[in-house]
Amino acid sequence: MNPNQKIICISATGMTLSVVSLLIGIANLGLNIGLHYKVGDTPDAPTPNVNGTNSTTTIINNNTQNNFTNITNIVQNKNEERTFLNLTKPLCEVNSWHILSKDNAIRIGEDAHILVTREPYLSCDPQGCRMFALSQGTTLRGRHANGTIHDRSPFRALISWEMGQAPSPYNVKIECIGWSSTSCHDGISRMSICMSGPNNNASAVVWYGGRPVTEIPSWAGNILRTQESECVCHKGICPVVMTDGPANNKAATKIIYFKEGKIQKIEELTGNAQHIEECSCYGAKEVIKCICRDNWKGANRPVITIDPEMMTHTSKYLCSKVLTDTSRPNDPTSGNCDAPVTGGSPDPGVKGFAFLDGENSWLGRTISKDSRSGYEMLKVPNAETSTQSGPIAHQVIVNNQNWSGYSGAFIDYWANKECFNPCFYVELIRGRPKESSVLWTSNSIVALCGSRERLGSWSWHDGAEIIYFK
């Protein structure tokens, strides 16, 4: 083949390939246009699959175009149908106590930003349980921790945080501002109450659903104060015990019945109880029982029994000869249902609790009768009604070589059980006045719940080495 023929052959081949490429491009364009109009003419997409749960609804859309499948998950919050808590169940049988939570706040605070607190407690709602306490508005390592031994200041607030964590500026929720508090959930929303202001003219602000609803002025001009642990609600009615007046003489105590943060009724204290402070309350069988502190006379604890539906109450003293306040005298040979058992020094009292359920009754107290050290649980059948009732079982919670403090009751009323399981917490106070080498006074928390099994004892003390804070 001569050179001219080669050129002609190569040119013809190139032209042929160019034409083929052009035809392929035209065909591809036409195919895309055709597919586009074909998809546009398709019938409406079928109703997406809906996967529903109690709390959310998940919608799954499957859209297929050009052999590509796009799956879109849309999560919609479903309005939960909540109802008011109803205290119809009895207390569960308890043969011992199992550990629920321990926050180790002081140990962690040696090297972390942990808030200075006191007067802690736990309270539950339909989603779970949270820890609460009155913050001092500073951290353990902060310079403002000096002077936090004092109970009342403008810097205190009721805070809450996830159970088991240590409270820090980064994980707490501010419930309300004040130096005395209570809080409870009615099944629909939470009510929190805080007292603040000067000793001679304090006031309470009642919050419901995250908003302030009601204000209550002082009625005796002497440190208006409340429970320092959770209140309890039944069918929307949430009774709260408040006291205004002397800590070492006759004071004015009221039981105030709230619904959605609004006052429904106010009762003056009636019955045999002579002095009421810092009540620890729980509910079962449509009755609320509050075990309180007589800071004036009694080493036996006052008991207020509340009918939340009728909005009425009675009061008396724990009948058992097992005394549970601190300070206290030695246990007498017989208890007293109608009057305080006097004696004990140097401290006039401490917040405490009991679960009073006939043969299934348990009392908590410090192991030391003179100071807030150690903690024990005693099973005392018929402690509420029998002056001869004594302990038949015993469990150490904190050994007597370690500090304890306030204690109180709480129950997860929304747990899926046939009964309400009793739970309690113990405040583990560290710092001043007993440990004066540091400037602060604060606490950690341990919480336990009832078990039908017979479990062993252990000491759940705070465990922080104060020397590390120097």
Curated annotation (Swiss-Prot):
This is Neuraminidase. Homotetramer. It is an enzyme of class 3 (hydrolase). One of its GO terms (biological process) is carbohydrate metabolic process. Glycans are attached at residues 51, 54, 62, 67, 70, 86, 146, 201, 402. Belongs to the glycosyl hydrolase 34 family. N-glycosylated. It is a single-pass type II membrane protein. Disulfide bonds join 92-419, 124-129, 184-231, 233-238, 279-292, 281-290, 319-337, 423-449.
